[in-house]
A protein has these predicted regions:
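Short acidic DE-rich linear segments
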Residues: 1, 67-72
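Short sequence/structural elements of tandem HEAT/ARM alpha-solenoid repeats
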Residues: 32-33, 71
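Charged, solvent-exposed alpha-helical segments that act as regulatory interaction surfaces
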Residues: 28, 66-67
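Short, charge-rich amphipathic interface segments used for partner binding and complex assembly
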Residues: 33-66
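Generic signature of intrinsically disordered, low-complexity, basic-rich segments
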Residues: 10, 14, 53-54, 70
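N-terminal acidic leader/helix
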Residues: 1-29
Length: 72
């Protein structure tokens, strides 16, 4: 997974958006709910970069540091 600063910023934005949407909908903000929201955004976007950002953000929420290849 490429973790340049711009991509990290986009993933953090996607994660924050997911948390805000859950909070504003009075839904529980759990790891599973955030992952589901990120996957929903991935499916809804037509933008290839957006799909990748949401996929990678969901993977980091799901796996933590195991999602990042060693050596980066």
């Amino acid at each position: 997974m490429d973790l340049d600063e711009e991509r990290v910023n986009m993933m953090v934005y996607a994660m924050g958006q997911a948390v805000m949407e859950l909070s504003l909908a009075d839904e529980p903000v759990t790891q599973a709910a955030i992952i589901d929201k990120l996957e929903q955004h991935r499916k809804e976007t037509g933008n290839v970069i957006g799909k990748g950002v949401n996929r990678d953000a969901a993977e980091i929420v799901r796996k933590g540091k195991r999602a990042i290849k060693s050596g980066q």
